[in-house]
UniProtKB/Swiss-Prot annotation:
It comes from the Bacteria. This is Ribosomal RNA large subunit methyltransferase H. It comes from Edwardsiella ictaluri (strain 93-146). Its main location: cytoplasm. Keywords: Cytoplasm, Methyltransferase, rRNA processing, S-adenosyl-L-methionine, Transferase. It is found in: Cytoplasm. The keyword rRNA-binding does not apply. GO terms for molecular function: rRNA (pseudouridine-N3-)-methyltransferase activity. Specifically methylates the pseudouridine at position 1915 (m3Psi1915) in 23S rRNA. Gene3D superfamilies: 3.40.1280.10. It is an enzyme of class 2 (transferase). GO terms for cellular component: cytoplasm.
Length: 156
C-alpha cells in the first residue's frame, strides 16, 4: 500500500520540508509515502474564494491515483487516537488500495473533495496551520505504522 499526501501549497518553510521528510523516509519500502503539492489559488482583496476552492479541489482530485481511498483531513472528521489510527492503517492495508490523504488550503477543502472522501480524519478540534499538518500527519502515520510493526518507536 502506498500513502499519498495531497496538499494545497507549494512553498513551505524549510522546517516543514525537514520535518516531513524526516518521517516519510522512515516508512518501510512496502509502504512508501509521497507528497503531491497542488498550487494554491491566488487570494487577494476581491478573490472569489468559492471559485478558488473549486479549482484547488479539481487539482487535488486529479492528483489522486485511480482507485485510491480518499481520506480528508478536516476538523469535523473522526478524531482517531494513536491506537485507533494504527487500526485504521491495518484496515487500509487489508483493503489493498493506496490511500490519498487530502489537506486543503487556508479556507479548507472543496465540497467536491469532501464528497469524494470515504473517510474524514480530524487531527484536532483546533484550526492548525496547514504546513504543520503535513508534519503531524507524517509523524502520526509513522507512529501508527510502528505500532502495527511492533517497532520500538511508540512507547505506551
Amino acid at each position: 500500500m502506498k500513502l499519498q499526501l495531497v496538499a494545497v501549497g507549494t512553498k513551505m518553510p524549510d522546517w516543514v520540508q525537514t520535518g516531513f521528510l524526516d518521517y516519510i523516509k522512515r516508512f518501510p519500502k512496502d509502504m512508501p509515502f509521497e507528497l503531491t503539492e497542488v498550487p494554491a489559488g491566488k487570494r487577494g482583496k476581491n478573490a472569489d474564494i468559492r471559485r478558488i476552492l473549486e479549482r484547488e479541489g479539481e487539482l487535488m482530485l486529479a492528483a489522486v491515483g485511480k482507485g485510491n481511498r480518499i481520506v480528508t483531513l478536516d476538523i469535523p472528521g473522526k478524531p482517531w487516537d494513536t491506537p485507533a489510527l494504527a487500526g485504521q492503517l491495518e484496515r487500509w492495508k487489508q483493503d489493498g488500495r493506496d490511500v490519498s490523504l487530502l489537506i486543503g488550503g487556508p479556507e479548507g477543502l472543496a465540497p467536491t473533495c469532501k464528497g469524494a472522501a470515504e473517510q474524514s480524519w480530524s487531527l484536532s478540534p483546533l484550526t492548525l496551520p496547514h504546513p504543520l499538518v503535513r508534519v503531524l500527519v507524517a509523524e502520526s502515520l509513522y507512529r501508527a505504522w510502528s505500532i502495527t510493526a511492533n517497532h520500538p518507536y511508540h512507547r505506551e
